[in-house]
Amino acid sequence: MPDYSYRPTIGRTYVYDNKYYKNLGSVIKNAKRKKHLLEHEEDEKHLDPLDHYMVAEDPFLGPGKNQKLTLFKEIRNVKPDTMKLIVNWSGKEFLRETWTRFVEDSFPIVNDQEVMDVFLVVNMRPTRPNRCYKFLAQHALRWDCDYVPHEVIRIVEPSYVGMNNEYRISLAKKGGGCPIMNIHAEYTNSFESFVNRVIWENFYKPIVYIGTDSSEEEEILIEVSLVFKVKEFAPDAPLFTGPAY
């Protein structure tokens, strides 16, 4: 008959020292982490010469002069949980609305200036007092001239409009600005051909929807404008020198 009684001499207790044992996963992760750090340091060395240059985080606030060209102002009613189309340069039906409501009579850019970037700026203000809600916006940059977007869409992953209730979109294409000269003469000849030949040949066409996070229908005053980022050339040397010059 087996003996199940406890005997201290039968059992053995082994204590392993974990000083020389490490988790295999942590070893591999640490090795990869060190490798990535070394590769990152090598990549940063190639960028060291760029430390001597300054750039603006927001291209709208970067070097150059901003020239504003107001397109139109109007009031739109926006229902809750929906966003309304306010800017569409891909569909031809919006062109009539834009040109007939065009505000500016003169072009704010002279002949000798070069356009570096064009921003579409949408400013929104509530028309009713004592309203507490935030503005929402969505946009897309398209090329297809035959595309006609929906007038109203549901709110899906929108962006909250930031400071001063101003929604700003850079229309610059990837790779640089717009080396256009003598644009004042182009604008004076024909505004429609100026937009089609000069602006849309070098910049993207925007589609913009706006909405609110309000649970009621809201009335919004919208101002849409183009802001041209113009390169400022160095002035000519004065004819005279002295304390007044």
Curated annotation (Swiss-Prot):
One Pfam family linked to the record: Polyhedrin
Alphabetized GO MF terms: structural molecule activity
Superkingdom of source: Viruses
Keyword presence, Oxidoreductase: no
Record bears the keyword tRNA processing: no
Keywords: Viral occlusion body
InterPro entries (UniProt xref): Polyhedrin (IPR001746)
Gene Ontology cellular-component annotations: viral occlusion body
Family in the record: Belongs to the polyhedrin family.
Function: Major component of the virus occlusion bodies, which are large proteinaceous structures (polyhedra), that protect the virus from the outside environment for extended periods until they are ingested by insect larvae.
Name of the protein this chain belongs to: Polyhedrin
Species this chain originates from: Orgyia pseudotsugata multicapsid polyhedrosis virus
Gene name, Swiss-Prot/TrEMBL: PH
